Regions:
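Canonical P-loop GTPase G-domain recognition
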Residues: 80-83, 91-145
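Conserved Switch II/interswitch segment of TRAFAC-class P-loop GTPases
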Residues: 12-16, 20-27, 36-100
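Switch I (effector-binding) loop of TRAFAC-class P-loop GTPase G-domains
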Residues: 1-12
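Alpha-helical hydrophobic packing sites
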Residues: 1-2, 21, 89, 128
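A generic secondary-structure signal
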Residues: 33, 73, 108-112
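Eukaryotic intrinsically disordered and solvent-exposed regulatory patches
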Residues: 4, 27, 108
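Active-site-proximal loop/helix segments of hydrolase catalytic cores
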Residues: 30
């Protein structure tokens, strides 16, 4: 399994998108692909989090948590700024409590990796229901907070 790489330019930035599987067996591919795609010179990274109950916890598991490992890899590449995209909020009924729990637990870990709170952005979203993905959320359960 390889990592998908795509490039595009905005008015201000040259963007390199690396999409890699989250499974631990593919971590060497992440490292190899990131160095080949100049990700080690990135200004910002997006860390995609699964908000569903059990999935987030598995990613934070001390012995095999891929969320933790990916955050550490991002930081080891010298990336200071990170966007944490908390996806699948629809599965947890757009629970602000769930989002806040994820933000608190992961935020603590990100700080321990050297990320500064001022350079971490948190975005709750639901890709399946197109909520807060491209435009502001329309679902009242989500937009109310």
């Amino acid at each position: 399994m390889t990592m998908a790489v795509a490039y595009f330019d905005s008015r201000k930035y040259h963007v390199v998108v690396l999409d890699s599987p989250g499974h631990k067996d593919f971590v060497p591919n992440i490292i190899s692909g990131a160095t080949q795609a100049d990700a080690a010179q990135a200004d910002v990274a997006i860390l995609l989090i699964d908000a569903s109950v059990g999935a987030f916890e598995a990613g934070m598991d001390g012995s095999k948590g891929q969320t933790k490992e990916h955050a550490q890899l991002i930081r080891s590449f010298g990336v200071d700024q990170i966007i944490v995209a908390v996806n699948k909020m629809d599965i947890v009924e757009y629970s602000k409590d769930r989002f806040d729990l994820i933000k608190q637990r992961l935020g603590t870990f990100l700080r321990s990796c050297g990320f500064k709170d001022s350079l971490v952005s948190w975005i709750p979203l639901s890709a399946m229901e197109n909520q807060n993905l491209v435009a502001a959320p329309s679902d009242v359960r989500f937009s109310s907070w």
